[in-house]
């Protein structure tokens, strides 16, 4: 237990004797190029990649009748995604699709909340771990937004009007 308390991720939590497979989580196998979930769908599960690779993509509206997929990142063994359903019931902000055959641990967010309520020391460490994952992703998103905004200003020659 001391090992878990020094560092806690969902991967280490899967090995916790009280966080039983079949009760709190289950394994799901995916073939390559298979959809895990779509942007806009509401989900109640958090995922850990046990093996394989997934791609995270978002819809970009080019015009009213044209859309394209933009690749945001790829995630690999041990990485986690879809954390937001733990905090709210908002739809997924991206589509996740497998790149290679994958085995995912699928964790019920409500059951995880109950487990962490009963184990607040683990809950604190897991939330801290999530902040270490989510903050770099947010920073990267901010950089991309700034770059695209700057590009848009230059493309429309608005940058020359700004003093």
Where are each of the predicted segments found?
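Cytosolic regulatory regions built on CNB/CRP/Popeye-like sensor folds
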Residues: 1-163
């Amino acid at each position: 237990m001391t090992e878990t308390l020094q560092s806690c991720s969902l991967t280490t939590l899967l090995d916790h004797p009280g966080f039983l497979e079949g009760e709190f989580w289950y394994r799901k196998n995916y073939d390559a190029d298979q959809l895990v979930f779509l942007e806009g769908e509401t989900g109640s599960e958090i995922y850990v990649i046990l093996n394989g690779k997934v791609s995270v993509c978002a819809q970009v509206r080019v015009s009213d009748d044209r859309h394209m997929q933009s690749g945001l990142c790829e995630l690999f063994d041990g990485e986690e995604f879809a954390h937001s359903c733990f905090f709210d019931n908002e739809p997924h902000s991206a589509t996740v699709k497998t790149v290679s055959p994958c085995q995912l641990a699928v964790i019920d967010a409500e059951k995880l909340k109950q487990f962490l309520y009963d184990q607040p020391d683990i809950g604190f460490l897991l939330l801290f771990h999530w902040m270490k994952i989510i903050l770099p992703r947010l920073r990267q998103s901010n950089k991309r937004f700034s770059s695209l905004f700057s590009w848009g200003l230059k493309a429309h020659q608005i940058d020359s009007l700004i003093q």
